[in-house]
């Protein structure tokens, strides 16, 4: 005959369970708040104290290692806080939800709570999401994915992101696209980021963007290097926004033109090798072509935050060199073929009162050529 032990859980154990779980369901992927109604937001107690190993020998997952210490079945190590639905799941299908899986879920949930509650108050950051139409592709911007990439260095200042997005039927190859998107971005920036920077206690911004490269450069120019900004990069492998390890041998390569007396052009061959003839088709043969590249250009080379720091350093020095040879009255023609985060940081490096005009080009898929998209004036970042 099976023996049962008491279901009674000491108040001290129950309080510790609530604290460790932060009042949320510990079933992996649920995370439901258990002290407030999701419908009315009224205070309501919906939590259940679920045993990993059962208080009954014939119950789900049995007694396990507690068979020789039944008095410890109600200890904190054998309890999960769960909602009613998840409690039913784990007890009705113990084969599907074995003890080692539940212990792992409990441990990871409690570790996450400890880390989050240990983050200093100055680690708050506004999550900025900027997306625009790119050919036929849909935006990969998902708030939860962005928050995961920030963690544990920063956590969101608000439950919702700062959205800089245009719901336009225009495509980047259509007439009027650049003018419409540029004007919309300026207006949205003024109404959101500029307002937060002026009046909000939190003045840090985590930027996640996936848009045509000229618009990303414009966004960076609006942000400037005066705002406290962390720019993120969408990676293909491994997929996501989280920064990866750094290759110590990495460096950016700057190629200077032999002739520095002609009108200047700046080519970024980072995501792919770019034939210089593509630039000459647009500007002609009389030009001084500066180029920034890497040893093996490809579309997923930028994996580390340190690489982005090195890019900023290289750009600041390069802009000084270009102005030294060409002055700041001659416009600089910019041809970007590079990651989104590099585009934003290029714009942030711009000094509106000191730099020449930037004429930014984009690859037009309809004619397979670079075409002029935006002009950033020397006296402003617009």
Feature names for model-found ranges:
Residues 1-16, 22, 31-34:
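A boundary/linker detector
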Residues 1-4, 62, 93-168, 214-226, ...:
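Defense-system signaling and execution modules centered on TIR/cGAS-STING-like, death/scaffold domains
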Residues 3, 32-79, 90-107:
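Histidine-centered nuclease catalytic patch
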Residues 18-26, 75-79:
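Short metal-coordination and nucleic-acid-contact micro-motifs, chiefly zinc-binding Cys/His arrays
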Residues 25-30, 83:
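Short cysteine-rich clusters marking metal-coordination/redox-active sites
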Residues 87, 206-217, 269-274, 333-344:
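Gly/Ser/Thr-rich loops at beta-strand to alpha-helix junctions
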Residues 247-318:
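Redox- and metal-dependent alpha/beta enzyme cores, enriched for Fe-S-associated oxidoreductases
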């Amino acid at each position: 005959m099976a023996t049962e032990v008491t279901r009674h859980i000491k108040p001290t154990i129950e309080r510790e369970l609530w604290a460790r779980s932060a009042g949320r369901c510990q079933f992996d992927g649920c995370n439901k708040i258990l002290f407030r109604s999701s419908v009315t937001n009224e205070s309501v107690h919906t939590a259940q104290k679920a045993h990993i190993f059962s208080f009954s020998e014939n119950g789900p997952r049995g007694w396990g290692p507690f068979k020789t210490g039944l008095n410890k079945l109600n200890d904190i190590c054998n309890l999960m806080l769960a909602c009613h639905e998840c409690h039913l799941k784990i007890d009705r299908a113990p084969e599907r939800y074995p003890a080692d899986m539940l212990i792992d879920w409990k441990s990871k949930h409690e570790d996450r709570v400890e880390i989050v509650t240990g983050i200093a108050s100055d680690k708050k950051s506004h999550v900025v999401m900027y997306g625009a139409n790119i050919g036929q592709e849909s935006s990969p911007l998902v708030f939860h994915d962005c928050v995961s990439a920030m963690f544990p260095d920063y956590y969101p200042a608000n439950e919702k992101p700062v959205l800089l997005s245009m719901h336009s039927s225009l495509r980047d190859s259509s007439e009027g696209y650049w003018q419409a998107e540029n004007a919309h971005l300026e207006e949205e920036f003024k109404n959101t980021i500029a307002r937060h920077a002026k009046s909000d206690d939190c003045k840090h911004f985590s930027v996640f963007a996936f848009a045509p490269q000229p618009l990303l450069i414009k966004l960076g120019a609006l942000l400037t290097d005066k705002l406290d900004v962390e720019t993120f990069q969408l990676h293909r492998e491994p997929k996501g926004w989280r920064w990866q390890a750094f290759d110590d041998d990495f460096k950016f390569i700057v190629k200077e033109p032999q002739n520095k007396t002609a009108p200047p052009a700046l080519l970024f061959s980072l995501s792919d090798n770019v034939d210089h003839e593509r630039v000459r088709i647009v500007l002609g043969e009389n030009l001084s072509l500066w180029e920034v590249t890497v040893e093996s250009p490809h579309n997923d080379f930028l994996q580390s935050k340190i690489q982005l720091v090195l890019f900023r350093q290289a750009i600041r020095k390069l802009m000084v060199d270009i102005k030294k040879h060409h002055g700041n009255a001659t416009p600089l023609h910019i041809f970007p073929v590079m990651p989104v985060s590099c585009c934003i940081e290029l714009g942030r490096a711009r000094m509106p009162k000191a730099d020449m005009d930037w004429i930014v080009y984009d690859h037009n898929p309809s004619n397979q050529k670079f075409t002029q998209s935006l002009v950033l004036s020397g006296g402003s970042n617009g």
